[in-house]
Amino acid sequence: MPLVTLGANIAQALKKNEVIPDATGSTYTLILTDPDAPSRTDKSYSEYLHHIVTGLKLKAINSGSADSDQFSAADVAASFATPIDFSSGHELVPYMGPGPPPKTGLHRYIYILFKETKPSLTKFDGDRPRFGTNKPGHGVRAFAAEHGLIPVAVNFYYAQNEHQ
């Protein structure tokens, strides 16, 4: 299977085989944010920053034999089981788990993986509410634009306080 860079045009003949994104040499930032802080109707702390890790690298997959462009199913499965090498990263903002206040309903906790286009950040001086600004609703979008981060993957989950 040939490797493909994100956003590339792919010939019809190549689309018949499984395609794997090429991330060789790239670094990434992972951010966890809560856009519903303190609640979906009160955005006074939104967005609330829960975690930032910079300088992450993706684990390479075994490219098969030197004279083959084929990958074994085991190589592909192993590469996607733990694709991020967390040992390569720098924890810019320590992890803070979910903690929605009582009677605020469901909160979305969103993980976003960004490709870094500039050198990795090494310092964050802001507070967690509003990503360190005094602007309600300020969060990951403005932070990413300011620091040259391009979103490449996202996932989220819901959590709520047990005392509703």
Placement of each model-derived feature along the sequence:
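N-terminus-centered regions that define maturation/targeting leaders and the start
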Residues: 1-164
